[in-house]
From Swiss-Prot:
Disulfide bonds: none annotated. This is Mannosylfructose-phosphate synthase. The lineage of its organism: Bacteria, Pseudomonadati, Pseudomonadota, Alphaproteobacteria, Hyphomicrobiales. The gene is mfpsA. Its EC number is 2.4.1.246. It catalyses: beta-D-fructose 6-phosphate + GDP-alpha-D-mannose = beta-D-fructofuranosyl alpha-D-mannopyranoside 6(F)-phosphate + GDP + H(+). Pfam families: Glyco_transf_4, Glycos_transf_1. Optimum pH is 8.0. It is an enzyme of class 2 (transferase). InterPro entries: Glyco_trans_1 (IPR001296), Glyco_trans_4-like_N (IPR028098). One of its GO terms (biological process) is disaccharide biosynthetic process. Induction: By salt. The keyword Transferase applies. It comes from Agrobacterium fabrum (strain C58 / ATCC 33970) (Agrobacterium tumefaciens (strain C58)). Its cofactor is Mg(2+); Mn(2+).
């Protein structure tokens, strides 16, 4: 990593140019200072890049977060005094799903380079996010002759394997919907061409080495993070006030996020049916979807409601849509249990936020986060495809008061100790600047052995 030991020169004269400039690239979805979380392709990754950008700004850098401009979006969006969203047009005015956006990125790169040169901008390095932005990031890196660090967030080979295992009868349709062949071809080129690949979990690191053929020295592991100034536990009295505001009664199980098949809300409903048979006070609250759902999202929501009806759970399951960003910490606190039931999940930002808020959490085994936690100490994990396993696991904190208290207390402690955005931004800068720094997580020590005597 010798080429990262010296930051690039600064030649512009504006006030902000006293600080080194970084280019983050996240091309798909609705990237904004206040994004409509839950909208198409707008979820945990958007939160990730925004929080990373903010922390890099607080650490003394000026950050331009590049994305695609479409619909009626403005060219710029100011996040704070050090961070702005820069929107570059390509592919017309309509929304384009992330699976097919790469076909328009040559135009995007040409427009981005034109913008950078026109404004005499000099960047120390590029950090791209997801494979579509990786295509763009590598082209800009080569044109500008600056380092390119790529964060995949999700891996095509891993996702394809998971989906073919979970839905073998639908395997023939996946290529048309998810464009795996082109995606994996581009991933192979990006990962071998960029200066460093940043894995967010040990699962990703393993796949990058074993399936993509990368050398270990070409990969650095930095986990996702959360904002510890927003997500933290509160007193019981405050929590009861929050519950009243949301109208929560009984023992509330919460799930939230985008309306997508891979999120496994249908599996959660099945598992909840097992819990509801054993715990009469159990209630399920699904805060899923966005303000303006597309046809596919509407279909998924209708299917979920039909599933609830077929199981006779209408009086125990509530649906709400978009949760405003300012309400996220409180809805986590209001719940008695949070469940991440994804069919596949590279990490699971929502689970970390829930743990940080003091809410006991159940995590899918089909992803990276469960390897970071100690079962029964920080959180619980289950196989969402096994409704009995998921249902019984959800029941445990409600039946064992000591376990509930431990998960609330130690889950929040685990999140604070390993997953704050400040530590993650510092890891990225240490990597770029060639400084030696203790990893946020050693891949061999993601979860210490469980100890009942905490």
């Amino acid at each position: 990593m010798e080429k990262f030991t010296k930051m690039g020169p600064m030649t512009t004269t504006s006030e902000t140019e006293r600080y080194p400039r970084i280019a983050l690239i996240s091309t798909h979805g609705y990237v904004a200072a206040h994004p409509p979380l839950g909208a198409a392709d707008t979820g945990g990754q958007v939160v990730y890049v925004l929080e990373l950008a903010r922390k890099l700004g607080q650490l003394g850098y000026t950050v331009d977060l590049y994305t695609r401009r479409f619909e009626d979006q403005p060219e710029f969006d100011e996040v704070d005094e050090r961070v702005r969203v820069v929107r570059i047009p390509c592919g017309g005015r309509d929304f384009i799903p992330k699976e097919y956006l790469h076909r328009h990125l040559m135009e995007w790169c040409e427009n981005a380079l034109r913008f950078i040169k026109k404004n005499d901008l000099n960047y120390s390095f590029i950090n791209s996010h997801y494979w579509d932005a990786g295509v763009a990031g590598q082209r800009l890196s080569e044109a500008l002759k600056i380092p390119h660090l790529h964060t995949p967030h999700s891996l095509g080979i891993w996702k394809k394997r998971q989906m073919e295992t979970d839905y073998p009868e639908k395997a023939d349709t996946f290529e048309l919907e998810f464009n795996f062949k082109e995606r994996i071809q581009h991933e192979l080129i990006i990962y071998r061409s960029c200066d460093m690949v940043i894995a967010t979990t040990p699962v990703q690191l393993d796949v990058l080495i074993e399936d993509y053929g990368l050398k270990r020295k070409h990969i650095h592991m930095i986990p996702p993070g959360y904002d510890d100034n927003r997500f933290f536990p509160v007193s019981d009295a405050t929590r009861q006030m929050i519950r009243q505001r949301f109208g929560f009664e009984g023992k509330v199980v919460l799930a939230l996020g985008r309306l997508a098949t891979n999120k496994g809300y249908d599996l959660l409903i099945d598992g909840f049916s097992v819990l509801a048979e054993r715990e009469p006070e159990a209630r399920l609250h699904l805060a899923v979807g966005g303000e303006n759902m597309d046809e596919q999202e509407t279909t998924i929501l209708n299917q979920l409601k039909e599933r609830v009806k077929s199981l006779g759970l209408e009086d125990k399951v509530a649906f709400s849509g978009y949760v405003a960003d300012e309400d996220l910490p409180d809805i986590y606190r209001a719940a008695d249990l949070f469940v991440l039931s994804s069919r596949y999940e590279p990490f699971g930002m929502t689970a970390i936020e829930a743990m940080a808020s003091g809410t006991p959490t159940v995590v899918t085994i089909h992803g990276g986060l469960f390897r970071a936690i100690s079962y029964g100490r920080h959180a619980l994990f289950a196989d969402p495809f096994d409704k009995e396993d998921l249902g019984i696991t959800m029941m445990k904190p409600f039946k064992h008061e000591r376990l509930y208290g431990r998960l609330s207390r130690m889950g929040a402690h685990k999140a604070r100790s390993l997953f704050t955005w400040t530590g993650i931004a510092q890891q990225l800068l240490a990597l770029v600047e060639g400084r030696t720094m203790m990893p946020v997580l050693e891949e061999a020590d993601w979860a210490e052995p469980w100890n009942d005597g905490d």
